[in-house]
Amino acid sequence: MKVVSLFSGAGGLDLGFKKAGHNILWANDIDKDAVATYRENIGNHIVCEDICNIDPVQIPDCDIVIGGFPCQGFSVANMKRHIEDERNELYKQLIRVIKAKNPKFFLAENVKGLMNLAKGKVFEMILADFRGLGYNVQAQVLNAADFGVPQTRQRVIIIGVRNDIDFEYHYPMPTHDKHEKNGLKKWVSVSKALSDLPDPDMPNDIPNHEYSKYKLQFNGYLGHRPLDHDKPAPTVTARGDNKGGVVILPHPNGQRRMSCRELASVQSFPVDFKFSGNRSSIYRQIGNAVPPVLGYAVAKMFNEYKGD
């Protein structure tokens, strides 16, 4: 199906949709490095521009609108009073584009914590906004580890099906399990995910295989505690330390931080996926991304639709 992608970043979600056979007509992001990465790996159909300045007429008609909108600007007060918060404004842009393009379906991805803001009231308002556009809306939390991503990353996936479309979206069934229950494969460990990568300190031609020299100080906080190499990594995030920077997970050997390439592998990006920008920018792009393997899992379920 024809897809329009908003808040595309480096293209993790888009890569999953592309692998599932969908045709991404148009994408958008404001981050120049992320857009350069997207163009290098996915296509030139991405527009580097503030979505607030884009007229929907410039966006092609499509079957699906996809995107992971920022959630930091949300509060009940903001939702009720329409207080202008820069990041809340981006959510309104998603609503604006869906309303203008009227796609058959939409998919919105966000952090699990969005469901708990103001005891769930903000999330209820968001779902109500989507339903007000004329869509049957459902939401479910998926753990990326359950689909083969070497990371316990939980995300809420919101699916909208236009009211006149005779289709029920089914969320993908897990392929992996922590305890290998029901014949499922065992969660992919971080050590397995990194096993094919050479030591970044040795000569190699692996792209983006440099790492931060920021000293490891294990204190129990995310990014500052040893990893269990036999388990998936904790959530890779671009926001999480007390300075608002990128949390760079330590390598399982406990001697250094993960390289950009290693962190990308934990996010399930293929090894030939090349990132643009300086090291900090690349770490941020990786942390903000939807794991492509999870993107593929949710994207392929749209293939069950057999309409026009």
Regions found by a protein language model. Give the residues of each.
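Conserved SAM-binding strand-loop segment of SAM-dependent methyltransferases
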Residues: 43-50
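Conserved proline-anchored active-site loop of SAM-dependent methyltransferases
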Residues: 4-17, 51, 61-78, 105-110, ...
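Class I S-adenosyl-L-methionine
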Residues: 54-64, 72-229
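Nucleotide donor/acceptor-binding cores
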Residues: 1
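Conserved SAM/SAH-binding beta-strand->alpha-helix loop
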Residues: 31
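Conserved SAM-binding loop
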Residues: 38-39
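Short beta-strand element of Class I
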Residues: 24-25
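C-terminal target-recognition/interaction regions appended to catalytic cores
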Residues: 199-308
